[in-house]
Amino acid sequence: MIDLRSDTVTRPTPPMLAAMSAAEVGDDVWGDDPTVLRLQATLAERTGKEAGLFFPSGTQSNLAALMAHCARGDEYIVGQLAHTYKYEGGGAAVLGSIQPQPLENAADGSIPLDKIAAAIKPIDDHFARTRLVALENTIGGKVLPAQYVADATQLARERGLATHLDGARVFNAAVASGKPVAALAEPFDSVSICFSKGLGAPVGSVLVGSRALIDVAHRWRKVLGGGMRQAGVLAAACLYALDHNVERLADDHANAAHLAAGLETIEQVKVQSLATNMVFAQFPQQHCAPLEAWLKERGILTQMLYASRFVTHMDVSSDDIDSFIDAVKGYFAAR
């Protein structure tokens, strides 16, 4: 089966499963799982932060970060297309009583600085207190421009705001930009990094930041139900991914470029964008449902919409991309 719906569909490789099976474990709620401790320390060092905290999901990692930065009735500034705002169930508002202030994203995924500045509320009892600016990198596959990140985080600091990065795919950004992940993490007070996407682990995200922030997030993790017992089995997969699956993300980026080039040869398809491991393309609306069914019959899973996203990952080869392109061509040729 060729699955282009997301990079969340990656499956553990036999060597990763072996690492999980051999993991030394303890009880992480008691803080004595050695493999979890090693993962947290390793990622903190790699990102240049003081401490890390292992979570079962990126949604929970992001939420704990927002709740560590903001109190009830506070506000965070975020892009309208950001995962923390649009795709995490409204958790900041529902569970954290944190008001989002969504702003329109620019085409490159950034939030214009003048809009951020204008959205910061004055100190007045009528307003929620603006406490945080949250960015995402990559966002829609796009790597945020380094100068923009520097300017946005500087603006936040000057206005007394904290900064959080949803870095679910920050290793994709690092590979694409040629910058170490520590350089991408450095401007932010906290960063959430996911291991169950392109890095290929089955479960897990790590939040990194200052020791004081992680101590607060640790309590919120418990409140949110994220405390796990013998979690070293999962942490071992993440450690394996750090050692073996980072540099190979370049292969996913190359396969995405290959996929985009193939779609561009099909008259009925309009490629909108290509960035890291994601391709966005438009298909005639009337063909989306039948094309998705056609592809599934041929062992290819997609989510066909008028504006469709295709995501490459470690379980998709260059030959698989060729099979996908041939199948799409075959569909339109039969019409």
Model-inferred region functions:
Residues I2-A293, R298-V316, F324-Y331, R335:
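Conserved PLP-enzyme active-site core in the AAT-like
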